[in-house]
């Protein structure tokens, strides 16, 4: 009798413990399975004007393809365009500031521009910036996955830069035209054989060069340069160097009435010009001579000739 009683006493705690453990495991399994099955159902509070207070810990789904429209059709919530009136709308679950909720974001969020920021993010019933004013308070899953409007501590997003209106200020009115009046006898030397000199000036500087008759003096020619200011300045310097090379002793605007003025008409070689290669080229010493072998000045003492007696 005592042995049987002891056996019963020993078996009762085991049975009790086993029963308790089994009951606990069965309840956990049931709760787990219930949680899995409930995640397949949409949260009716989340898709209402009240909002779900459980957040990510909710056992029901907060993300349904199609958003509120699909949930309203599935659960027969009536007209999806007119949400049910809220019984206890709140600004924030932890803030305690009560504001009436509506189908659109009509007021600014009081927590968004603070140091701690708004913890509700895209689910907030209030606008995070002026661009969200008037937008629906409840957006679908696709819109919730869109990039945020700003950082946690950011304020209003910066507007895009305005489009450029017309050409830049630096290029406005840059094109210009300049005239250089020279002796008509120098025109052939400035043009060069086959236009080699004028072509080189246009190729190096990028200007448009043309030689025309003077308006009033038949003994002069106008060299017209068209381009921007830097191009015209560079071309003018090259024309001045060319004129000095052709006739270093003849002024640019001196009429060709004397023998000295008529002499520079031809380019010629050592036999055709008495001052050919008789002086050193100043630009060659500086390394800025652009005429090369066609230069009428000596590029070094080995090319320098003695002037005619």
Curated annotation (Swiss-Prot):
User: What range(s) does the KH domain occupy?
Assistant: 175-239
* GO terms of biological process kind: regulation of gene expression
PROSITE patterns documented for this protein: KH_TYPE_1 (PS50084), ZF_C3H1 (PS50103)
> What InterPro entries is this protein classified in?
KH_dom, KH_dom_type_1, KH_dom_type_1_sf, ZFP36-like, Znf_CCCH, Znf_CCCH_sf
Cytoplasm listed as a keyword: no
* A molecular function (GO) term: mRNA binding
Q: Which domain of life is it from?
A: Eukaryota
Tell me the keywords, alphabetical order: DNA-binding, Metal-binding, Repeat, RNA-binding, Zinc, Zinc-finger
What SMART domains does this protein's entry cite? KH (SM00322), ZnF_C3H1 (SM00356)
Zn finger regions (C3H1-type) covering which residues? Answer: 37-65, 103-131, 275-302
What segments bear the compositional bias annotation Low complexity?
Answer: 251-265
Task: Tell me what organism the protein belongs to.
Answer: Oryza sativa subsp. japonica (Rice)
- UniProt name for this protein: Zinc finger CCCH domain-containing protein 31
Q: Which pairs of Cys residues are joined through disulfide bonds in the record?
A: none
Q: Which SUPFAM superfamilies match?
A: CCCH zinc finger, Eukaryotic type KH-domain (KH-domain type I)
Gene Ontology cellular component list: cytoplasm
Region called Disordered, residue ranges: 1-36, 86-106, 249-273
The UniProt entry, under Pfam families, shows: KH_1 (PF00013), zf-CCCH (PF00642), zf-CCCH_2 (PF14608)
């Amino acid at each position: 009798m005592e042995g049987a009683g002891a056996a019963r006493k020993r078996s009762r705690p085991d049975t009790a413990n086993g029963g308790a453990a089994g009951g606990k495991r069965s309840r956990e399994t049931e709760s787990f399975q219930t949680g899995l099955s409930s995640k397949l159902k949409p949260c009716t509070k989340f898709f209402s004007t009240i909002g779900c207070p459980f957040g990510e810990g909710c056992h029901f789904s907060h993300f349904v393809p199609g958003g509120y429209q699909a949930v309203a059709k599935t659960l027969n919530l009536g007209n999806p365009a007119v949400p049910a009136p809220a019984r206890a709308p709140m600004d924030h679950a932890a803030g305690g500031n009560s504001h009436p909720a509506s189908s659109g974001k009509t007021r600014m969020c009081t927590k968004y521009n603070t140091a701690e920021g708004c913890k509700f993010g895209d689910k907030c019933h209030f606008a995070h910036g002026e661009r969200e004013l008037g937008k629906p308070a409840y957006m679908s899953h696709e819109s919730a996955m869109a990039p945020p409007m700003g950082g946690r501590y950011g304020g209003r997003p910066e507007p895009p830069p305005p489009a450029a209106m017309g050409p830049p200020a630096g290029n406005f009115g840059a094109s210009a035209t300049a005239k250089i009046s020279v002796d008509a006898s120098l025109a052939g030397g400035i043009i060069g054989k086959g236009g080699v000199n004028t072509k080189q000036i246009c190729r190096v500087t990028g200007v448009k060069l043309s030689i025309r008759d003077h308006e009033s003096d038949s003994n002069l020619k106008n060299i017209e340069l068209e381009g921007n200011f830097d191009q015209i300045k560079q071309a003018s310097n090259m024309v001045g160097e060319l004129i000095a090379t052709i006739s270093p002793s003849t002024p640019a605007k001196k009429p060709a009435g004397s023998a000295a003025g008529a002499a520079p008409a031809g380019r010629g070689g050592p036999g055709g010009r008495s001052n050919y290669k008789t002086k050193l080229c100043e630009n060659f010493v500086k390394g800025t001579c652009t005429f090369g072998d066609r230069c009428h000045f000596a590029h070094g003492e080995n090319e320098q000739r003695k002037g005619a007696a």
